[in-house]
Amino acid sequence: MIGTDTSHVIAFTKSFNGPPGPNHVEGARVVAAYKGGSPDVESSYTRVDKFAEQLKTEWKIEFVDDIAQLCPKVDAILLESVDGRTHLEQARQAFTCGKPVFIDKPLASTLEDAREIARLAREAGVTWFSSSSLRWSEIATTLKHEDSTGVLTWGPGPTEPHHYLDLSWYAIHPVEMLYALMGPGCVEVTRTIGKTGDIIVGRWEDGRLGTVRTQPQSWKYGAVVFRPKGVEQSHPDMKSSYTPMLREIVKFFRTGTPPVSNEETLEIFAFMDAAQKSKEQGGKPIKLR
């Protein structure tokens, strides 16, 4: 495990290393970690030591001084650092281990870094994937239909000033849900800025429209799926947990086959990059690059 500055490290370790129960995930154990941390990101420097200590005392996780020392101790790597800016350099080092890597959200803070991570992995012959757990939420799995004509998703949208792609910090969750429901194929994005949230509209190559509504002051997620003969909407009691994603991670570590293609993940970042440029240009439609 790389990076102990996110609550995910505690939740994931409980699921992998904890006793049998509804959220227990068989097939993997967290055994060693590198602390990491970012001194200029509040949610990192205020938590990195606390979570590291919790992993040591409650779960007896061994800590190492650098990523190279992690390599011989593990069979696969969870790159968990909360700061997406650190992922490129940490992934560069992790790939030298030659072992499969899961990179937690956000994959990176820029499209360029995301593409460079993918290039380095290809060069090293290492398999990887990155995703939000919302891809496997009841919202995304229950409402997915092959005949959908369009999708609207919504979710929290707080930002972090050091992340150029502001959607990557937290709105990655509703963006990931959008792609889970729509599939890849977006060609153009338009973003409208509002006082209480933004609306990001993607036009797919087949003419469908996929929309994300950010809600900075709300922690609720949802979706509406448009179909030829009606509309389906999520309801508030639909559940979301890390467990389905963790099971996919274990399967990926064993098979080397990512549950989300690297190409789709990179398109998600191209979508967010186009949304950022649309915002900077006053809502102008921007083609994905």
How does the language model describe each region?
Residues 77-78, 254-289:
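C-terminal helix-rich "cap/oligomerization" subdomain common to oxidoreductases
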